[in-house]
């Protein structure tokens, strides 16, 4: 895989560390491969860190599953801390390998309290989570990983990718977070990227935002009323009710972010997430907002 140069002018500086993954999520935008790539990418990423601009605000570590690097992930984090002391680290992981407390402590410690862990929760119900993750016991291992991260006082971004198998339970997920995961730093409800496995499993997993907005509305406001920080990623403002706009983030990496012809006359375009260039089709129901009227 050819990695993009690290650049302080972009909103996405990422170290891709492996195409391997111990999950096989039904909507994965970058399906895993059985590639013997960890050592090669590790050496490549060490060099990229050494040559990176020193003013990067944040750098991502992603895959595949970064924790499959084992101790090499810790070495990578230490190298970032040494070479880029002012840069935060954002690790995207399914969280399962953080079930090992000793390993979790070492990863968190290496980051010197400047790591954000982006961890997915697919459902409050273990069966649905495991189906979506494509792996048995994924739910229990992820939950154990989340608790271990919390015990290490890690910063946790809980990610809920909305799909056909979980959108009916969005409010239940919010209640589950309140009762069982009150330590997460924030929760992000995310629109799907229509590429990779999401296309292959479209009939099973794909759902349009216009089908779940009312469920999302209830889930977001439930967490907000309980004073949990809550965000919405990857869903254009025109598809959200006006009361959800304050939660929407411009979350899409600039290298795969696009706005459509219908967006040209929209008064909220500058604040909107837009869409994915990587998606085979845009969301249904996109429209122009004039003078704030939805």
Region locations from a protein language model:
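Canonical Radical SAM [4Fe-4S] cluster-binding loop centered on the CxxxCxxC motif
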Residues: 4-42
């Amino acid at each position: 895989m050819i990695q993009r140069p690290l650049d302080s002018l972009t909103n996405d500086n990422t170290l891709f560390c492996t195409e391997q993954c111990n999950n096989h999520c039904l909507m994965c935008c970058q399906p895993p491969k059985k590639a013997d790539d960890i050592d090669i990418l590790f050496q490549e990423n060490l060099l990229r860190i050494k040559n990176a601009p020193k003013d990067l605000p944040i750098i991502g570590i992603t895959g595949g599953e970064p924790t499959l690097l084992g101790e090499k992930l810790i070495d990578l984090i230490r190298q970032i801390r040494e070479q880029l002391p002012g840069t935060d680290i954002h690790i995207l992981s399914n969280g399962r390998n953080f079930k090992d407390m000793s390993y979790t402590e070492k990863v968190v410690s290496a980051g010197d309290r400047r790591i954000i862990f982006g961890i997915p929760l697919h459902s409050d119900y273990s069966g649905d989570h495991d189906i979506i993750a494509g792996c048995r016991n994924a739910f229990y291992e992820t939950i154990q990983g989340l608790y271990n991260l919390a015990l290490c006082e890690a910063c946790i971004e809980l990610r809920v990718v909305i799909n056909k198998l979980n959108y009916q339970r969005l409010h239940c997920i919010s209640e589950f977070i309140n009762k069982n995961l009150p330590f997460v730093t924030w929760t992000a409800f995310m629109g799907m990227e229509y590429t990779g496995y999401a296309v292959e499993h479209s009939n099973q997993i794909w759902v349009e935002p216009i089908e779940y907005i009312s469920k999302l509305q209830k889930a977001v406001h439930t967490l907000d009323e309980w004073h949990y920080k809550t965000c919405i990623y990857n869903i254009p403002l025109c598809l959200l009710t006006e009361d959800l706009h304050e939660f929407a983030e411009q979350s899409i990496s600039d290298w795969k972010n696009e706005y459509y012809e219908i967006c040209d006359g929209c008064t909220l375009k500058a604040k909107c997430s837009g869409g994915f260039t990587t998606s085979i089709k845009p969301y249904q129901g996109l429209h122009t907002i004039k003078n704030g009227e939805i």
